[in-house]
Regions:
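Gly-rich Lys/Arg/Thr-decorated short loops/hinges at beta-loop-alpha junctions or inter-strand turns
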Residues: 1-3
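Active-site-proximal beta-alpha core segment in soluble small-molecule metabolic enzymes
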Residues: 5-9, 13-16, 28-193, 205-206
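Conserved PLP-enzyme active-site core in the AAT-like
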Residues: 24
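Short, well-ordered beta-to-alpha junction loops that form the rim of enzyme active sites
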Residues: 196
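Active-site loop ensemble at the mouth of alpha/beta enzyme cores that anchors a bound cofactor
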Residues: 200-216
Length: 216
């Protein structure tokens, strides 16, 4: 019978990795992505180790967000995939979770929700990752609809996700950056483009927010 496997998480190493990220980010804010139990490292322990030096945590589900709050984490929490029911929108509003809007259905649900506290919304635009997000052509109309809603705070953020930023010889990251900038050229808003590979290898993509997971 094999011995049980044990993973030892070096929180000092995580803190050092975050310091490197902060130095690279300069004046950008940092969202530490800790979905899937911080990729198996333990979301609670990781979030407690990093909470003093990040601006937000990114998670995949409402359950992950609630887990952080119940553990006493006060740092802002963002739902990267948005919400999937009216109940989740209500919970996000009550707990001050920011949420993504990745399609027309989510946009309509946000606008039609019965909530008293406006939501901070990030609009994700699919510029080539093809995982989630609205099309670049939809951006202006969706932005206008959300901006006009009392359910949405004034600080809407526009985001995209790079598909191959870890390949420095593939210029598709530059193509994606051009697509998002063209789509939002008539908007004056905060933005979030960088994942870990983008922050390290493509400094021209650094924006108001950097969303970092693997490099931490």
């Amino acid at each position: 019978m094999a011995r049980p496997a044990k993973a030892l998480i070096d929180l000092d190493a995580l803190r050092y990795n975050l310091k490197v990220a902060i130095d690279l980010s300069q004046y950008s804010k940092i969202m530490a992505v800790i979905k899937a139990d911080a990729y198996g490292h333990g979301a609670i322990g990781v979030s407690k180790a990093l909470s003093d030096n990040v601006d937000a945590f990114g998670v995949a589900s409402i359950e992950e967000a609630i887990e952080l709050r119940e553990a006493g984490i006060k740092t802002p929490v963002h739902l990267l995939e948005g919400t999937f029911s009216d109940d989740e929108i209500t919970i996000a509003s009550k707990n001050n979770f920011s949420i993504s809007c990745v399609n027309q259905k989510q946009k309509n649900a946000i606008i039609e929700a019965q909530i008293s506290v406006p939501l901070n919304v990030w609009i994700f635009v699919d510029t080539g990752m093809h995982r989630l997000g609205i099309t670049p052509e939809e951006l202006i109309s969706i932005y206008k609809d959300l901006s006009a809603s009392d359910n949405v705070s004034d600080n809407i953020i526009i985001a995209t996700h790079f598909s191959c930023a870890d390949d420095l010889e593939n210029d598709f990251t530059s193509t994606q950056l051009s697509r998002i900038k063209n789509a939002m050229k008539d908007l004056s808003v905060n933005t979030s483009f960088c994942n870990s590979a983008g922050l390290i290898g493509w400094p021209q993509t650094r924006a108001d927010w950097n969303r970092l997971g693997i490099m931490l």
